[in-house]
């Protein structure tokens, strides 16, 4: 999987290329080091491969490297941008298998989110708020100013649309279409016009 993509951004000065990686990172703004940029790109691919293989959990804030009982942000899935960012490079970097854990999580979120949509909004289909976790929590949590953000599930679905867009497999679209439709129907049922902007 890792060897599917090679990236060549040019050659670095041999004296710079011979430096330890941490020194190259510290000096990156001083001059050109295209080989470090290529290495960094491949490092990002490695992180996704290592933390999101089929049959595992999706990549979260700290991934598989968390060693704390009480990690920053509880090592949850912050689904207002962080989780999405983990997966943005997957399709363009030939890592489509790495999306499987996220796809599975979305099916599980939709199941939990259907209960949440009914309980909180008295509306059909499904919703997920700002965060989720191993148990696929979909309720607003933590601070109200960011927790009451019901677009987490819908925003995550962009990755599944990208998967379809890259592969154009009709069977895949049939599989994930109920998720897309359910999220869209939730918003169709809950969006309201702002009377001050008519």
Regions found by a protein language model. Give the residues of each.
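Acidic/polar, glycine-enriched structural segments that form the non-catalytic walls/loops
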Residues: 1-77, 95-116
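Loop/turn elements at helix/coil->beta-strand transitions in domains of secreted/extracellular proteins
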Residues: 33-36, 169, 198
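Short, glycine/acidic-rich hinge or "gate" loops at secondary-structure transitions
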Residues: 55-64, 175, 192-198
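Aromatic-rich carbohydrate-recognition surfaces in CAZymes
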Residues: 72-193
């Amino acid at each position: 999987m890792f060897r599917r993509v090679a990236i060549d951004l040019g050659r670095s000065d041999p004296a710079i290329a011979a430096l330890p990686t941490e020194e190259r990172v510290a000096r990156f703004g001083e001059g050109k080091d295209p080989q470090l940029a290529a290495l960094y790109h491949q490092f990002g691919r490695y992180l996704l491969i290592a933390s999101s293989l089929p049959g595992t959990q999706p990549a979260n804030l700290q991934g598989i490297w968390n060693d704390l009982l009480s990690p920053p942000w509880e090592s949850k899935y912050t689904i207002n941008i962080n989780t999405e960012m983990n997966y943005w490079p997957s399709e363009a970097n030939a890592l489509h298998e790495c999306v499987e854990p996220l796809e599975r999580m979305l099916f599980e979120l939709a199941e939990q989110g259907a209960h949440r949509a009914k309980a909180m909004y008295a509306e059909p289909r499904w919703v997920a708020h700002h965060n989720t976790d191993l148990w696929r929590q979909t309720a607003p949590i933590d601070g109200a100013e960011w927790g009451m953000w019901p677009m987490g599930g819908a925003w995550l679905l962009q990755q599944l649309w990208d998967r379809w867009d890259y592969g154009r497999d009709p069977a895949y679209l049939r599989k994930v279409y109920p998720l897309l439709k359910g999220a869209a129907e939730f918003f169709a049922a809950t969006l309201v016009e702002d009377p001050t902007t008519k």
